[in-house]
Each structure stands twice: as structure tokens, then as C-alpha cells.
Amino acid sequence: MNVILLEKVQNLGSLGEQVAVKSGFARNFLIPQGKAKPATKENIAEFEARRAELEKLAAEALASAQAVYEKMNGTVVTIESVAGDEGKLFGSIGTADIADALSKAGFDVERKNIRMPEGALRYVGTFEFDVELHSDVVASITVEVKATEE
């Protein structure tokens, strides 16, 4: 199925490109999320009429992501959790916990944008993670996990 991308989609293409994707991917993901439209003659004409507006919105989103990047990159957040004698946490710390800590630090981040390639944190220590603010802007943060006395 051919679709027109209405925004940049990672590993697929950028705004305005016509790409061939599997029909299920288009129907179940791209079209419902407003990232693409079927590449019909009517939709192509409508897109060309709105191209400048969509490019302006994309540029504004990139500019705001870069502004947040300037403030967030290198930020250190501390999360306290109950841990055993050897530093193993009772439970784990995941993306939701990191997103909460970032929101307390003044950053509005969705948990799906936090990249934890090795999964949830289960030990006390200092860890580095990436936060995808935009498909072109990725900030690096440091999370310090400290043990608390119950």
C-alpha cells in the first residue's frame, strides 16, 4: 500500500514522501495516528495544498524539542528505592519512574520516549539513558538510584 507521510517516521521516511508499506502497518498504525494518508490522487492534491503548513508545524516541533534538549541534556535525576544489603532493589525502576522523576525536575516527557535498552533497573547505581524528544533530537540523562531505609 502506498501512503504519503504527514510527518517524519523513523526508519521509514520524512514529511511528504510517498512510501510503500504493508497494508496492515498503514491501517493499524500510520493512518490512525495521523502519521500518513493513503496515496490517492485526492490526498496527494490535498497534501500539496497543505505542505507549507505541515512543514511549518514540523519546524516548530523540532525547534521546541531542541529548546528542551538544551535544558535536559546532561540532567541528573535521583530516584530512591528500598534495596537489600547487596544493592539489589526490592522491585525495579522502569520508564514510568524515570518519567515521574523528570517531571518533578520540570520536564514533560512521556515514558515511551525513554530508551532503556537493557530493561528495568534492579540495582543501586548510576545509569545513562537516552530520551527521544523528537525523531532528530535525543537527549542524554543520568539516573542515580539510591537505597533508602524502608
From Swiss-Prot:
A single GO molecular function term of this UniProt record: rRNA binding
Protein name: Large ribosomal subunit protein bL9
Pfam families for this protein: Ribosomal_L9_C, Ribosomal_L9_N
Entry's Gene Ontology cellular component terms: ribonucleoprotein complex; ribosome
Keywords, sorted A to Z: Ribonucleoprotein, Ribosomal protein, RNA-binding, rRNA-binding
Family the entry assigns: Belongs to the bacterial ribosomal protein bL9 family.
Single GO biological process annotation from the record: translation
PANTHER family, alphabetized: 50S RIBOSOMAL PROTEIN L9 (PTHR21368)
Function: Binds to the 23S rRNA.
